Amino acid sequence: MLKMNLQLFAHKKGVGSSRNGRDSNAQRLGVKRGDGQFVTAGNIIVRQRGTKFHPGKNCGLGKDDTLFATIDGYVKFERKDRSRKQVSIYPERQAAQA
């Protein structure tokens, strides 16, 4: 008795799948209100990771380091000291420009 051992091969090459093709959503960080701009209480001024900008007068710091206005007024970016910057809110435009 004669037995045949047949082996069939694929006629199309198998294609591997890529492990790429994903991307995370942007965090939308940065300065939201510029120097001298009018803001109302609760407006977000800066969204940040860590305290690149520190809160000054009439400015609050959220738990994710977001700076926000606590009163209606004008935004002023100031130097806290040699290496640190702070953001303050002044009710009058003259104080914010000085």
Swiss-Prot record:
GO CC annotation, single: cytosolic large ribosomal subunit
GO-annotated molecular function: structural constituent of ribosome
Keyword Transmembrane helix: no
Record-linked Pfam families: Ribosomal_L27
Source taxon at top rank: Bacteria
Keyword set, alphabetical order: Ribonucleoprotein, Ribosomal protein
PTM field: The N-terminus is cleaved by ribosomal processing cysteine protease Prp.
Record-linked Gene3D superfamilies: 2.40.50.100
GO BP, sorted A to Z: translation
Propeptide: 1-9
PANTHER family: LARGE RIBOSOMAL SUBUNIT PROTEIN BL27M, RIBOSOMAL PROTEIN L27
Family membership: Belongs to the bacterial ribosomal protein bL27 family.
Name of the protein this chain belongs to: Large ribosomal subunit protein bL27
